[in-house]
């Protein structure tokens, strides 16, 4: 159970991947419950590029705590000390003798014969906010007679630390770039002298379609952030920021020639 809301960024998948990695099990064995503020643990919210970095680290801490408890219970049932066992995601094994007890058997024993649940809950708050980095390069064509501009190609290189899920990261970058292109070339809120909004529907407020954004190419520059889960940083907002200055500079360069 997590407190972060998956609003289309795929955080349920990413956080499940982190949990599976920590517990050495398959991602499909992790069940992520949809957020319900009645029962979900507190979370500051899925905004400010915080979900992977902040909630992800909370997931890692929780799984490490749960893993420790699994080893303690397994050692108890095997009749040895917790420091004398190893957990491989499926079995707790006593290192000296090779005796084993399965994860499922530990769960059954806890459910039927124990007063203490096998559960863990942790929180994470970071005193630092390591920034991601991104380079954006735009190619445009301009009709100098009419002023009509066409975006031909956009190339982005992103440093978001360890890329937890390359497919989800790539589509999030592409979506953010499309938003940035809209901010640079199409979107505007217009008011009259009395303060009435003239762009209060999608008939007046133009957002780019797939035909308007040209070719978008995305690459990742790998790095490792020691304060993040598995070395990951954020990726949400940085991708919207670069299209405006990149396109502006491309227009200036093209106009000068």
Protein language model regions, located:
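Structural motif
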Residues: 1-3
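Thiamine diphosphate
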Residues: 11-19
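C-terminal catalytic domains of large/alpha subunits in multi-subunit enzymes
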Residues: 18-257
């Amino acid at each position: 159970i997590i407190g972060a809301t998956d609003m289309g960024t795929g955080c349920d998948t990413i956080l499940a991947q982190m949990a599976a990695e920590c517990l050495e099990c398959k991602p499909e064995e992790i069940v992520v419950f949809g957020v319900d503020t009645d029962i979900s643990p507190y979370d500051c919210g899925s905004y400010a590029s915080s979900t992977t970095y902040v909630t992800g680290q909370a997931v890692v801490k929780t799984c490490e705590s749960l893993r420790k408890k699994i080893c303690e219970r397994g050692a108890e049932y095997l009749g040895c000390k917790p420091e004398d066992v190893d957990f491989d995601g499926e079995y707790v094994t006593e290192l000296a003798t090779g005796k084993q007890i399965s994860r499922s058997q530990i769960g059954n024993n806890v459910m039927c014969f124990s007063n203490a649940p096998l559960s863990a809950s942790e929180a994470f708050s970071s005193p630092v906010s390591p920034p991601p980095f991104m380079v954006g390069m735009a190619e445009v064509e301009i009709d100098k007679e009419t002023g009509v501009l066409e975006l031909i190609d956009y190339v982005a290189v992103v440093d978001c630390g360890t890329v937890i899920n390359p497919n989800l990261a790539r589509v999030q970058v592409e979506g953010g770039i499309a938003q940035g292109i809209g901010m640079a070339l199409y979107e505007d809120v217009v008011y009259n002298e009395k303060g009435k909004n003239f762009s209060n529907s999608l008939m007046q407020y133009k957002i780019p379609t797939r035909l308007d954004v040209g070719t978008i190419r995305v690459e990742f520059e790998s790095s490792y952030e020691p304060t993040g889960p598995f070395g990951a940083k954020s990726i949400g907002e940085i991708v919207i920021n670069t299209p405006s200055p990149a396109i502006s500079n491309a227009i200036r360069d093209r106009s000068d020639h």
